[in-house]
């Protein structure tokens, strides 16, 4: 059976309203499913799914008064683990180099701090963060990948700072 890609990626947030505003109004991802789940042990979980394109979804959960779930924690994965920003990130397809530049300009116009376009040889990217501190990326392929690309080898020297926002 062939692989079909992601159904969804699930993440947590401490502020679902702020998260929803960012993903709907800044990134223009449509909310396609919203739930309030009553937890038998107490509290509730608010849950929202965004369509990021091609029926691939990004989900966020916010726990309210759920036993065993801290009221405050670090929702930004990299900060929570103490690793550089680029290590855990989510990349969305831009479609083309022109669309990537257009997306960067749109994000800047909406007040988002965005990196310059980063050229990875096989792709170009921009990096920014959501209100939870999650590292996000828009990316586009600049060429087809080949057998040489699949070989683990030293290719370049990079700056972690260039690949993400401080």
Located regions from the model:
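A short, polar/proline- and glycine-enriched secondary-structure boundary/capping micro-motif
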Residues: 69-74, 147-149
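Acetyl-CoA-dependent GNAT
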Residues: 62-65, 141
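Core segments of cupin and vicinal oxygen chelate
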Residues: 12-63
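Short Gly/Pro-enriched turn/cap motifs at secondary-structure boundaries
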Residues: 38-39, 81, 116-117
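Vicinal oxygen chelate
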Residues: 5-14, 49-52, 71-166
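N-terminal beta-strand motif that seeds the catalytic metal site of vicinal oxygen chelate
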Residues: 1-18, 43, 87-92, 144-166
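Alpha-helix termination/capping residues and helix-transition junctions
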Residues: 3, 26, 84, 109-111
């Amino acid at each position: 059976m062939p692989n079909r890609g992601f159904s969804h990626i699930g993440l947590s947030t401490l502020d679902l309203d702020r998260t929803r505003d960012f993903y709907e109004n800044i990134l223009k991802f449509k909310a396609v499913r919203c739930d309030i789940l009553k937890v038998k042990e107490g509290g509730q979980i608010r849950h929202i799914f965004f369509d990021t394109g091609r029926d691939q979804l990004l989900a966020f959960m916010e726990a309210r008064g759920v036993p065993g779930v801290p009221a405050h924690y670090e929702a930004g994965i990299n900060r929570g683990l103490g690793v550089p920003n680029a290590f855990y990130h989510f990349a969305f397809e831009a479609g083309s180099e022109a669309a990537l530049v257009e997306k960067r300009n749109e994000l800047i116009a909406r007040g988002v701090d965005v990196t310059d376009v980063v050229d990875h040889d096989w792709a170009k990217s921009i990096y920014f963060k959501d209100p939870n501190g999650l590292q996000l990326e828009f990316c586009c392929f600049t060429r087809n990948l080949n057998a040489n690309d699949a070989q683990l080898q030293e290719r370049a020297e990079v700056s972690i700072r260039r690949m993400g926002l401080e």
